[in-house]
């Protein structure tokens, strides 16, 4: 374990986190937990939390040596689970576990996380990086994300609101997102992947926060679901 490299990485994280913090969050870099305020404009606020990863899409990123978008996937997989319940993402935390800390590689991953938070309009308030050479094989890593959002109680999207006669709308995906990659890797095992296919495979998961929240603000949604991983 390279302590000096880890310390340098923490400084890099701190600089990025400060850029993505808003006035609702206390400046608590170096603390044991992140602190935030509940929006005062909400009369009966409910907190919605979600955690997720990006599955074996990580192996595609490793194979293509492209790490600057996998962080966007991580944010997307978490915040997209918040918005289908009517919540507006407020803050995000990440967990990176890796065989050996390679600063440039992990910086690119984190840059993607920061970009994802910017798209989702939420704050990156903390995280954890674990270097575990005895657990992960050479060059291997894994990611986990944690997102929290707020919603007014009456605006929660619950299945009880869905009724017969409702109009069903399907929103297209931007690609494979972050599901089904075990099958994809099986199909392309021991085969040369064409450049165009490579580009599609690593395309980041679309973050639907702006679109869904805008519609929900006008009370136009009774129910919402992510049709990924079985729906």
Annotate each language-model stretch with its function.
Residues 1-231:
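Helix-biased detector of long, well-ordered alpha-helical tracts
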